[in-house]
Amino acid sequence: MSGVISKFNFATLLFFLGHGLAETKDGRTEQLFQDLHDNIGWVFEDSKDGISISRKPIQGMGLKAVMVAKKTMIPKEIIQSVIMDVGNYEKFLKSIGPIRSHEVQRSSDWVDGYQFIPIDLPLIGDREYLFRMYSDGYNSEDTTSIIHWHLLEKRDDVLVGLNNQNNDRVYLDHGAGLWMAEETLSDTIVLSYRIYMDPGGALPEFLVDMMNKVSVMNIFKDAIAEAKLRQDIIVQ
């Protein structure tokens, strides 16, 4: 089973596309951000290497959102810079399989990106998506999120330029995530990554949920490891 899980990275940390692309940040995406941000409703399931794993049912959705969280002393600004560094994902997100990530466009507030996820199993198409990521909360009242991202509408003309392989790809268009840094009474923050993504296709829900948990955990651990390396360089 672990070999199968490593080939599916549907929840891989995600991200985007720029001017001229229509966003799918509609009413249901706004509601999804609210559900992810709300600390009520998360059910703890497990803890590994000091990282807690929780899930939460999302109204009207067949799958559950996933949250991983850990206390850390790494400054949130460093973590934020790591997550926004889409162009270098392939260098430090080493545990999520052979994905391809591209930074498409960047402004002072957001970065647009693309990810391609090859699926090495019969009868199951590869996955791809465009996303937009912001270095702040999802609205003016959200003061704890340091990153929020959401998927973008499909644009075939853009996708052909990014991945011209001739295969049956499934485009993912409904998903969002939050990286939150909640202050504590000590010098630590509670860093959490909360995500909901529909991987598309006719896959059993239990299998998708299990794969999503593994993938989100790996993204979280790799991002923290990279942030620690960058912190050590700054301190030197």
Where are these regions (language model features)?
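Hydrophobic h-region of N-terminal signal peptides that target proteins for export
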Residues: L13-A22
